[in-house]
Amino acid sequence: MANNEESRGLKSLFDWFANRRKAGATNPERQEREIADGLWHKCSKCGVLTYTKDLRANQMVCVECGHHNRVDSDERIRQLIDQNTWRPMDENLRATDPLQFRDRKAYSDRLREMEDKLGLLDAVKTGLGQINSSPVALAVMDFRFMGGSMGSVVGEKITRLIEQATQRRYPVVIICTSGGARMQEGMLSLMQMAKISAALERHRDARLLYIPVLTNPTTGGVTASFAMLGDIILAEPKATIGFAGRRVIEQTLREKLPDDFQTAEDLLKHGFVDDIVPRTQLKNTLSQLIALHQPVPTTPPMVLWETMSLSSTAAE
């Protein structure tokens, strides 16, 4: 098995070098520098080396084994939203440190480090846009920012997005990836579960569509709240989805869990998600679902109305 993976990886590498030789001679030092600079990506599942440009063209899905690599919020928005239609919301909301929380370092220092490293103020981006010309309110969680944990800013931004969608009568799509509620904010982070759920209930009362997309991983308080409240719940292949961690459950039950436990495929089998959609098909799938749930026009077509009027006149 390992030999086959190495062979596939070497074949891909040789093909690329062969193409480069056709385009023009390069020296070994330049080739090594290009690999080190991120021109190549090694799949964590099958070990195949893929030209990063080709991997991005395939939405960061391994062309050999189909493994879905983790992507950031900007890449998600690029993949899903029609060009030049994205309008971000609440970009300047920033977390505070009301508990003066400190573990190995102060929470305020962690927030500052994340901002400096990633250019993000928190773990979600929200906004309005279009998916194949259909308007949508979209929230995209970003696992790079403190494990995608849900704090007061994440909760507030998602709640405001849902309220705006309800007012505009837009469907809501949330791309979920999270380790759960943010412990550094204590009860304030747990309150976001109820706040978002209440906003979604008002959205549902208005007979509007909500679709969560569960990606790897979706766990903790996010799973226990808005991730599982969708009208239609989608998941990416092989995504880890659950509440408590696998090791915690095994230690509590003192039992060995099945290999597919807490996977998207296992949840689909037991009815917790409605479908598993490969990332390359996600935009079109969302577009079709949104189109199917558009409200039926209440005004009769003009031709039908004219026919009814003529019939009424003739009868008189």
UniProtKB/Swiss-Prot annotation:
Query: What does the Swiss-Prot or TrEMBL cofactor note state?
Result: Binds 1 zinc ion per subunit.
Named in its record, the pathway it takes part in is: Lipid metabolism; malonyl-CoA biosynthesis; malonyl-CoA from acetyl-CoA: step 1/1
The Gene Ontology CC terms held by the record are: acetyl-CoA carboxylase complex
Q: Which GO terms describe its molecular function?
A: acetyl-CoA carboxylase activity; ATP binding; carboxyl- or carbamoyltransferase activity; zinc ion binding
Q: What is its EC number?
A: 2.1.3.15
| Keywords attached to this entry | ATP-binding, Cytoplasm, Fatty acid biosynthesis, Fatty acid metabolism, Lipid biosynthesis, Lipid metabolism, Metal-binding, Nucleotide-binding, Transferase, Zinc, Zinc-finger
Subcellular location field: Cytoplasm
Name the reaction it catalyses.
Answer: N(6)-carboxybiotinyl-L-lysyl-[protein] + acetyl-CoA = N(6)-biotinyl-L-lysyl-[protein] + malonyl-CoA
For this entry, list what GO says about its biological process: fatty acid biosynthetic process; malonyl-CoA biosynthetic process
Xref: NCBIfam families:
accD
Subunit structure of this chain's protein? Acetyl-CoA carboxylase is a heterohexamer composed of biotin carboxyl carrier protein (AccB), biotin carboxylase (AccC) and two subunits each of ACCase subunit alpha (AccA) and ACCase subunit beta (AccD).
This protein's name: Acetyl-coenzyme A carboxylase carboxyl transferase subunit beta
UniProt gene name: accD
